[in-house]
Amino acid sequence: MPRKNFKFLINASNLHMGGGVQVAVSLIDELSRMDDLPAGLSVLASDEVHANLQNVNSNCLRFGGYEVFNTYGISTLWSQLDSKASGFDVVFTVFGPLYLRSTCAVNIVGFAQAWIIYPNNEISSSLPFVQRVKKRLKFFVQSLFFRRADRLVVELEHVKIGLVEQGILDADQIDVVHNCLSSVYLQPDHWKPMSVSISKKKFSLGFVGRDYLHKNTNLLPHIKKILNDKHGLDVDFYVTLNPAEWSAKSEFFRGSIRNVGSLKVVQCPNFYQQMDAVIFPSFLECFSATPLEALAMKKPLFASDRRFVRDVCGDFAWYFDPENPITAADLIAGYIKNRAGRDDEQLTAAREFVIKFSNPCQRAEDYLRILQNAAIDCSLC
């Protein structure tokens, strides 16, 4: 058993949007509910993580220390994080890299930067030369900080393989802890409505996520146009972009797609409820919870034919080539005309599959075990 006086720090100060916030909220909330929570466990939460923890009524007073603190990228090197992380045996950054000048603690970092393990991806090759060089430089610098970790934690096996192939860390320094559905999706009493209403006059397809390049959202208006021109189907597409992301989209995009704005974790189930199906056209991921969330809400999922989806969803998703809007439109049209409203049995089976895939409580226990084992191993050195 681990010593009672080990001190652990969960660092979520650098997470401000997207799936990283959801994972951190789920992890911290589950830890707060443990009966045998270590007394020496402290948390640094960003404003966004803290706000979402409040939305799910998490009892953050259960931790030995809890502070709202924000860090942003490489500027963290000049922040107070060094002093706040001092005195701990283990520092676990939910998703890195961790930008610290130095640390005496065991440094464990969550890894979810697919650009580092798949540098020659579709997006990179399509970028202008200068932008491509900037991207490569950015992720090279990030990789240097990931290499400083004592251990990395990843969400799927293909990520571990990629890290080893890129020479980031050895296989025995990398742990796999499957991501999972947030417990929010199993607790309807925690769900909150969106601030905008959605018209249900047409078949509705939803995309949940930020507008990162690899999310491939620019494919959506092309799919919509092909559905209309080729198949005679007027389908509404909804996205969850923040104001800056929305204003940066083309007139073609904004004239074709509807935006409900960014959502809190507790609002996402309501968004899924109002969709007839979910689309996930991403080129590149380590892992994304969106496919799991869609299936858990019993929504048909149209997704990129990529390993990061197939490894999780198996035969429960409808797959298309993310580089080809015609294949996506044909797939969606076939579903609408032949399957829509007549596949409840498959959707129910998909939901049951997702719930069994992994669960938030087990994930939190797995993370905590990694921290405790690292502290014990270090104390024996």
Region roles according to the model:
Residues 146-173:
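A short, active-site helix/loop in glycosyltransferases that binds the activated sugar's phosphate group
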Residues 340, 344-378:
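A charged, aromatic-enriched C-terminal amphipathic alpha-helix characteristic of glycosyltransferases
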Residues 9, 196-215, 221-224:
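Conserved donor-binding/catalytic core segment of Leloir-type glycosyltransferases
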Residues 131-152:
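Membrane-proximal helix-turn-helix segments that form the acceptor-binding/catalytic region
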Residues 283:
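Aromatic "clamp/platform" in nucleotide-sugar-dependent glycosyltransferases that forms part
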Residues 318-326, 333-340:
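Conserved acidic donor-binding segment of nucleotide-sugar-dependent glycosyltransferases
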Residues 60, 246-269:
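Nucleotide-activated donor-binding/catalytic signature segment of Leloir-type glycosyltransferases, i.e.
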Residues 300-303:
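Short hydrophobic beta-strand element within catalytic cores of glycosyltransferases
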